[in-house]
C-alpha cells in the first residue's frame, strides 16, 4: 500500500468534509428518538429547540475536525486508529442532530466550515506534539461537550421529547469517549489551554445558536 502524499491527504480531508456537511447523513445506528413521539411545540419553543440542536450539530462538526486533524499526524498507528474510530462514532451524533434540525424546519450553522477547519488545525497542532497531548484534548473536549449537553437538556422545552432522547444518548457516549481517552494516556492540559478552549466554545455556542 503506497504512502499518501500531502496532496492525497488534502483531497481525502476535503472529501470527508463534503460528506460530513451533506444532509441527510447516514448513521450506523438509528436515532435514539426514532420511537419517541413529540408533544406539541409552540413556534417559539420550536425555534429555541432548533437553536440548541444547531449548537450541538456544530459541536459535532468541531469534534470531527479535531479528531481527524489529530489522526492525520498521530505518532502511532494505534492512536490514529483510536481517533478515527472516535470520529466515526461522533458521526452518528452529527447525523442525529442533522435529522432533528430538519424535523424542526431548521438548518445547520452557516459558520460550520470555519469551525471545522479551525478545529482540524488545532487537532493537527496538538497531534504533532505528542499522542498524550492529543488524547488530553479529546478528554477536555468531551468534558466541555458534556457540560453543553447537560445545560441543553435542562433548557429544552418540556414537550421536546425527540431532541431530549438524542441528547441523553449523546451525553452517555461522550462520557465513554472521555474515559477511553484518559485510559489511553490523555495528558492533563494546562489551565491556560483549557481557558482558551472554553472561550472558543462560548463564542461557537453563541454564534451557532443564532446563525
UniProtKB/Swiss-Prot annotation:
<keyword id="KW-0831">Ubiquinone biosynthesis</keyword>
<feature type="binding site">
    <location>
        <position position="90"/>
    </location>
    <ligand>
        <name>Fe cation 2</name>
    </ligand>
</feature>
<feature type="binding site">
    <location>
        <position position="93"/>
    </location>
    <ligand>
        <name>Fe cation 1</name>
    </ligand>
</feature>
<comment type="pathway">
    <text>Cofactor biosynthesis; ubiquinone biosynthesis.</text>
</comment>
<dbReference type="InterPro" id="IPR012347">
    <property type="entry name" value="Ferritin-like"/>
</dbReference>
<dbReference type="InterPro" id="IPR011566">
    <property type="entry name" value="Ubq_synth_Coq7"/>
</dbReference>
<feature type="binding site">
    <location>
        <position position="142"/>
    </location>
    <ligand>
        <name>Fe cation 2</name>
    </ligand>
</feature>
<dbReference type="Pfam" id="PF03232">
    <property type="entry name" value="COQ7"/>
</dbReference>
<feature type="binding site">
    <location>
        <position position="60"/>
    </location>
    <ligand>
        <name>Fe cation 1</name>
    </ligand>
</feature>
<feature type="binding site">
    <location>
        <position position="174"/>
    </location>
    <ligand>
        <name>Fe cation 2</name>
    </ligand>
</feature>
<dbReference type="GO" id="GO:0006744">
    <property type="term" value="P:ubiquinone biosynthetic process"/>
</dbReference>
<protein>
    <recommendedName>
        <fullName>3-demethoxyubiquinol 3-hydroxylase</fullName>
        <ecNumber>1.14.99.60</ecNumber>
    </recommendedName>
</protein>
<comment type="function">
    <text>Catalyzes the hydroxylation of 2-nonaprenyl-3-methyl-6-methoxy-1,4-benzoquinol during ubiquinone biosynthesis.</text>
</comment>
<feature type="binding site">
    <location>
        <position position="177"/>
    </location>
    <ligand>
        <name>Fe cation 2</name>
    </ligand>
</feature>
<feature type="binding site">
    <location>
        <position position="174"/>
    </location>
    <ligand>
        <name>Fe cation 1</name>
    </ligand>
</feature>
<feature type="binding site">
    <location>
        <position position="90"/>
    </location>
    <ligand>
        <name>Fe cation 1</name>
    </ligand>
</feature>
<keyword id="KW-1003">Cell membrane</keyword>
<dbReference type="InterPro" id="IPR009078">
    <property type="entry name" value="Ferritin-like_SF"/>
</dbReference>
<comment type="similarity">
    <text>Belongs to the COQ7 family.</text>
</comment>
<keyword id="KW-0560">Oxidoreductase</keyword>
<keyword id="KW-0472">Membrane</keyword>
<keyword id="KW-0408">Iron</keyword>
<dbReference type="InterPro" id="IPR047809">
    <property type="entry name" value="COQ7_proteobact"/>
</dbReference>
<dbReference type="GO" id="GO:0008682">
    <property type="term" value="F:3-demethoxyubiquinol 3-hydroxylase activity"/>
</dbReference>
<dbReference type="GO" id="GO:0005886">
    <property type="term" value="C:plasma membrane"/>
</dbReference>
<dbReference type="GO" id="GO:0046872">
    <property type="term" value="F:metal ion binding"/>
</dbReference>
<keyword id="KW-0503">Monooxygenase</keyword>
<keyword id="KW-0479">Metal-binding</keyword>
Amino acid at each position: 500500500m503506497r504512502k499518501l502524499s500531502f496532496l492525497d491527504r488534502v483531497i481525502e480531508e476535503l472529501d470527508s468534509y463534503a460528506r460530513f456537511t451533506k444532509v441527510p447523513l447516514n448513521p450506523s445506528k438509528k436515532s435514539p428518538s426514532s420511537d419517541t413521539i413529540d408533544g406539541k411545540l409552540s413556534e417559539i419553543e420550536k425555534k429555541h429547540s432548533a437553536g440548541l440542536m444547531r449548537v450541538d450539530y456544530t459541536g459535532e462538526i468541531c469534534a470531527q475536525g479535531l479528531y481527524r486533524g489529530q489522526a492525520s499526524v498521530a505518532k502511532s498507528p494505534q492512536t490514529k486508529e483510536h481517533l478515527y474510530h472516535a470520529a466515526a462514532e461522533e458521526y452518528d451524533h452529527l447525523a442525529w442532530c442533522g435529522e432533528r434540525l430538519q424535523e424542526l424546519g431548521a438548518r445547520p450553522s452557516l459558520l460550520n466550515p470555519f469551525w471545522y477547519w479551525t478545529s482540524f488545525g488545532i487537532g493537527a497542532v496538538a497531534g504533532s506534539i505528542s499522542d498524550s497531548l492529543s488524547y488530553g484534548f479529546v478528554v477536555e473536549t468531551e468534558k466541555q461537550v458534556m457540560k453543553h449537553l447537560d445545560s441543553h437538556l435542562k433548557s429544552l422545552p418540556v414537550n421536546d421529547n425527540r431532541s431530549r432522547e438524542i441528547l441523553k444518548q449523546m451525553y452517555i457516549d461522550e462520557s465513554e469517549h472521555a474515559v477511553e481517552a484518559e485510559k489511553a494516556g490523555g495528558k492533563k492540559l494546562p489551565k491556560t489551554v483549557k481557558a482558551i478552549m472554553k472561550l472558543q466554545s462560548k463564542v461557537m455556542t453563541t454564534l451557532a445558536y443564532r446563525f
